[in-house]
Amino acid sequence: MKTGIIQQSLSGFYDVIADEKIYRTRARGNFRQRKIKPVVGDHVEFSAENQQEGYLLKILPRRNQLVRPPVANVDMAVVVTSAKEPAFSANLLDRQLIALEAQDVTPLIYFSKTDLLTDDEYQQLLPTIEGYRKIGYQVYAAREPFDSDQLANLMEGLKGNIVTMMGQTGAGKSTLLNHLAPQLKLATGEISQALQRGRHTTRKVSLLDVNGALIADTPGFSSYETFDMTVNDLPQLFPEMAKISADCKFRGCLHIKEPQCAVKEAVNNGIIMKSRYNDYLQFHELIANQKPNYKK
């Protein structure tokens, strides 16, 4: 019996990294019976007499699991955020950030397509960039999106971690990976003018060994509707709100209608970004109104 990490999932086969080799495996039937689905990033026990015919025996406990993209035991996520074509969406960025906060994954925000902005448009984006930095997020937003110093700094921070690339379809995840590791030659697709959505250029989930980091290149998406947290958990997923919520008059303050709320005061004083607070209110309403998801 061996232990390893699932490096790729494709059509019922799972490629496992172990002993600096890759073993192709299948899941035993009892996984299906117990409705357990192995995902990329899983630490597994498996048997294999050769590198082509192995079987997964056990999935070891997961530290976390992202639903979209489906990756387990993630340390960091590079949220590739388009500045233009498709247009920047703070709401989509915040949806992704709270999903990562809920799973205890460290987000890194990477603005792509900044070179498509006019100088005026770039200047207008800078306060937003600085706003996310002020919260504590690491933000990469050079005027040239693939600036060599910026890429080197990003790569240095990713080494030794399981990393997922996530972001809106067409945001440039594959393009960024191609700049980090040109030898990969990943497929990239031009934006569909009709839908303003990218053609999905990625059809499988893989962990790519890029200069010492295991990076998932995964299908893009056009929206992000996964809200697995409660309304009471939500304020803690906005770090800038969690930081000052102790100053609210009422414990468990949801920062909506409560009097003497430190968070609302911080929004009014420009300490907390208005766009973030508006997204918080929208997410709160969505979570409060969504139907319970009973897992079988």
Curated annotation (Swiss-Prot):
CP-type G domain ranges (all copies): 63-224
Gene Ontology molecular-function annotations: GTP binding; GTPase activity; metal ion binding; rRNA binding
One Pfam family recorded for the sequence: RsgA_N
Metal-binding in keyword set: yes
Cofactor details (free text): Binds 1 zinc ion per subunit.
Binding site residues for GTP: 112-115, 167-175
GO CC annotation terms, alphabetical: cytoplasm
Cofactor: Zn(2+)
Localization: Cytoplasm
Enzyme Commission number, as recorded: 3.6.1.-
Cited function: One of several proteins that assist in the late maturation steps of the functional core of the 30S ribosomal subunit. Helps release RbfA from mature subunits. May play a role in the assembly of ribosomal proteins into the subunit. Circularly permuted GTPase that catalyzes slow GTP hydrolysis, GTPase activity is stimulated by the 30S ribosomal subunit.
Subunit-structure text: Monomer. Associates with 30S ribosomal subunit, binds 16S rRNA.
Recorded family membership: Belongs to the TRAFAC class YlqF/YawG GTPase family. RsgA subfamily.
Record protein name field: Small ribosomal subunit biogenesis GTPase RsgA
Natural source organism: Limosilactobacillus reuteri (strain DSM 20016)
Source species taxonomy: Bacteria, Bacillati, Bacillota, Bacilli, Lactobacillales
Gene that this sequence comes from: rsgA
